[in-house]
């Protein structure tokens, strides 16, 4: 199938909310080796975000059931086996995306904006792996995630306006990484607050087409800050995450 047909099919799949099909089309487009257009990049990102999102959400539900069935051995074993099945799916999806990023997307990114977008994506998918990792594996995965976010963060500060939705989305997800994965609420808050304040200070640089995206992410940054500063008791707080714009 040629590229245009695959992209067309991906859009159809998106409208039908068949995200596995959508991801499979956009994976094929990526494997053709050319740099993706902004539209193709967003289709790829939306597809995989939904595919992995469904598994992350299932994993949380089943993990919580597994913890609640302590003492009921049969039930707990069933929940554990089901969680492990979901984990395998989740890992396969993340490894698919990370392989596309390493082989095609990051090496082919010619603009700073694309580079930041893909490095952020690399940070995100290592973070999703870190959520389900345990033991020795986890440390290496967490480091990979942090490195990708950090590299993206440095490029974004040099090359992009503080109001750019990709720079804001990166700050949002990197701060979630500090809060949820590294358990560093102070660092998470300081990163989110700085990103929010810098964007507020330069609101006049907001372009017409990204106005909605940028202000939405700023709202999410502020929501997380409110949640995290009130959450000093260390309750499990579900942080909002960046839309892939």
UniProtKB/Swiss-Prot annotation:
Homodimer. This is 14-3-3 protein zeta. One of its GO terms (biological process) is negative regulation of TORC1 signaling. Keywords: Cytoplasm, Phosphoprotein. CDD domains: 14-3-3_beta_zeta (cd10022). Belongs to the 14-3-3 family. GO terms for molecular function: DNA-binding transcription factor binding; identical protein binding; phosphoserine residue binding; protein domain specific binding; protein kinase binding; protein phosphatase binding; protein sequestering activity; transmembrane transporter binding. The gene is YWHAZ. The record marks 56, 127 as: Interaction with phosphoserine on interacting protein. Adapter protein implicated in the regulation of a large spectrum of both general and specialized signaling pathways. Binds to a large number of partners, usually by recognition of a phosphoserine or phosphothreonine motif. Binding generally results in the modulation of the activity of the binding partner.
């Amino acid at each position: 199938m040629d590229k245009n047909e695959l992209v067309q099919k991906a859009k159809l799949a998106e409208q039908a909310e068949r995200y596995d099909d959508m991801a499979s089309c956009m994976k094929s487009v990526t494997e053709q080796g050319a740099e993706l257009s902004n539209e193709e990049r967003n289709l790829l990102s939306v597809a995989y975000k939904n595919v992995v999102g469904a598994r992350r959400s299932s994993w949380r539900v089943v993990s919580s059931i597994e913890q609640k069935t302590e003492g009921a051995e049969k039930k707990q074993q069933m929940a554990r086996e089901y969680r492990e099945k979901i984990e395998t799916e989740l890992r396969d999806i993340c490894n698919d995306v990370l392989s596309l990023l390493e082989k095609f997307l990051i090496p082919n990114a010619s603009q700073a904006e694309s580079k930041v977008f893909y490095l952020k994506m690399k940070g995100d998918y290592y973070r999703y792996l870190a959520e389900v990792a345990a033991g020795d594996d986890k440390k290496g995965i967490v480091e990979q995630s942090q490195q990708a976010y950090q590299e993206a963060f440095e490029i974004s500060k040099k090359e992009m306006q503080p109001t750019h939705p990709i720079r804001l989305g990166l700050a949002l997800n990197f701060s979630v990484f500090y809060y949820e994965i590294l358990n560093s609420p102070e660092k998470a808050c300081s990163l989110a607050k700085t990103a929010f304040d810098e964007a507020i200070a330069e609101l006049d640089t907001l372009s017409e087409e990204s106005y909605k995206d940028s202000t939405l992410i700023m709202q999410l940054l502020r929501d997380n800050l409110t949640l995290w500063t009130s959450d000093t008791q260390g309750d499990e707080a579900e942080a909002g995450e960046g839309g892939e714009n």
